[in-house]
Amino acid sequence: DRTIWPKKGFSIYWNIPTHFCHNFGVYFKELKQFNIKYNSMNNFRGETISLFYDPGNFPSMVLLKNGTYEIRNEGVPQKGNLTIHLEQFTKELDEIYPKKIAGGIGVIHFHNWRPIFRRNVDNLKINKDISIDLVRKEHPKWDKSMIEKEASNRFETSAKIFMEKTLKLAKEIRKKTEWGYHGYPHCLSGSTDKPSFDCDALSMSENDKMSWLFNNQNVLLPSIYLKNVLKPDEKIHLVQERLKEAIRISKNFKHLPKVLPYWWYTYQDKESIFLTEADVKNTFKEILTNGADGIIIWGVSYELTDRKRCEKLKEYLMKILGPIAFKVTKAVKENTPLNF
């Protein structure tokens, strides 16, 4: 069973492409002294953790910088070619993640649509529009609700096939790796003008409908990214709610998939600003005490394009992130209270 405390283990992973910083003579060898797990040579993919951005050839409406969309593999899952996608996925893994380096955590990062029809909002709404259009053209006499229901069914059935087959293939061809999709379980709660962090009843029942995915995952990887604009108690509430839902889902399955939230060291709404020491402590503490199995520290390559930025991150690791990570892992290992 999942025990909150004492914990069997709690691992903090480094999933930031800091190998780019080697070009500027900035290295992150100190990760080890802070008990942070990383790949050898600081590679982005390897024996500890590997992230695959938009792998294979998922049917997608890819939003371009000029605001238009590029249609890939027929655009939406109900029109897409599964074979083309899986062949491309295998080829990519062979190129960038050969068996000899594979192990640890494997993360499929795909966000061009969500498998629950209703959740395709904002930039993803185009998936709903196209799906509805396809049915409307076939059945011009149907009323709006019939069209939407059919569009939703077709979309969700095909989306499930693409996500499930990809996951099963990944597990089959890289057996040593523990696989999961980035950003799930996900909650769509609250209107945009009034954010709510609670996972509402509808979101929870939709997540239960996704048991076909979670039952096949070795790890659940919800994302916990903070906004600077939030008040301190709102930030804590956000972390608690995201974790509560992931733990609830994990407990639904005999194999109790690990819960490893993705945590970004910058604010979502102010990417130039690193999280304050207080925010790091509060979020790490909440992640630990709410029952997660670890934390994945995430960052993106465009934050590491010059020496100055690399040095800024290195300093942040040395002064704030590293010491806090060390205290958290030490408290778990020694079964002592966390003193910040």
UniProtKB/Swiss-Prot annotation:
SUPFAM superfamilies: (Trans)glycosidases (SSF51445). N-glycosylated on at least two Asn residues by identical heptasaccharide units composed of Man, GlcNAc, and Fuc residues in the molar ration of 3:2:2. It is found in: Secreted. Disulfide bonds join C21-C310, C187-C199. It holds the Pfam family Glyco_hydro_56. InterPro entries: Aldolase_TIM, Glycoside_hydrolase_SF, Hyaluronidase, Venom_Hyaluronidase. GO terms for biological process: carbohydrate metabolic process; defense response; hyaluronan catabolic process. GO terms for molecular function: hyalurononglucosaminidase activity. GO terms for cellular component: extracellular region. Signal peptide: none annotated. Glycans are attached at N66, N81. Expressed by the venom gland. Keywords: Allergen, Disulfide bond, Glycoprotein, Secreted. Its main location: secreted. Transmembrane segments: none annotated. It comes from the Eukaryota. Has no hyaluronidase activity. PANTHER family: HYALURONIDASE (PTHR11769:SF35). Belongs to the glycosyl hydrolase 56 family. This is Inactive hyaluronidase B. It comes from Vespula vulgaris.
